[in-house]
Amino acid sequence: MSLGIMTIKETILKYGKNEKNTGKTDVQIALLTNQINHLQLHFSQHKKDHCSRRGLLKMVSKRRKLLNYLKKKNISCYTKLIESLNLRR
């Protein structure tokens, strides 16, 4: 279950300002959110796929840690990102 290359590049350009800025916290959170949304669609069809569910939980945990880091470092960027990704926090 992977995202398309174009989807990844568009996300990187939207949140990282250029295609090589993949390490920015905003970009990492946006990419994880896209992967999580993609996996949620997968689980609507494959309810017993427990191995992938473990990967999903790891992604959610990593995104939560990155969001906590961003909240500590830059609260304005954090609030903009939460609104643009439609996350509840």
UniProtKB/Swiss-Prot annotation:
CDD domains: Ribosomal_S15p_S13e. GO terms for molecular function: rRNA binding; structural constituent of ribosome. Keywords: Ribonucleoprotein, Ribosomal protein, RNA-binding, rRNA-binding. Disulfide bonds: none annotated. The keyword RNA-binding applies. Transmembrane segments: none annotated. It comes from the Bacteria. It holds the Pfam family Ribosomal_S15. One of its GO terms (biological process) is translation. GO terms for cellular component: cytosolic small ribosomal subunit. InterPro entries: Ribosomal_uS15, Ribosomal_uS15_bac-type, uS15_NS1_RNA-bd_sf. NCBIfam families: S15_bact. Belongs to the universal ribosomal protein uS15 family. One of the primary rRNA binding proteins, it binds directly to 16S rRNA where it helps nucleate assembly of the platform of the 30S subunit by binding and bridging several RNA helices of the 16S rRNA. Forms an intersubunit bridge (bridge B4) with the 23S rRNA of the 50S subunit in the ribosome. Part of the 30S ribosomal subunit. Forms a bridge to the 50S subunit in the 70S ribosome, contacting the 23S rRNA. This is Small ribosomal subunit protein uS15. It comes from Buchnera aphidicola subsp. Schizaphis graminum (strain Sg).
